[in-house]
């Protein structure tokens, strides 16, 4: 497995590491980036709420034991816990010692080269 860090930096956010993702050995850098991107997106639930099934009995299709949430979740005034946003264009993924940026389509280096 390769461990990568997902850094939310889009939308004017101060960059912060939100997750470490243990990526199975995949044949290409692009597939490694895609895996980290997919499993830090809210598609069928919440990637950051670490429950396989929600309190209402619905399955959390975005639960992945290979994802470790690094930034604490927030709670509102009523105590409701809220998950993190999806990884988006402008966010970064650190593989080894090199950062990649989520582009409009795919990924780029910090210098703007397509992956």
State each model region's role.
Residues 83-115:
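Short, compact, well-ordered microdomains
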Residues 24-95:
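Short, conserved turn/kink motifs that form compact alpha/beta structural patches or helix kinks used as
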Residues 1-12:
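A short beta-strand micro-motif
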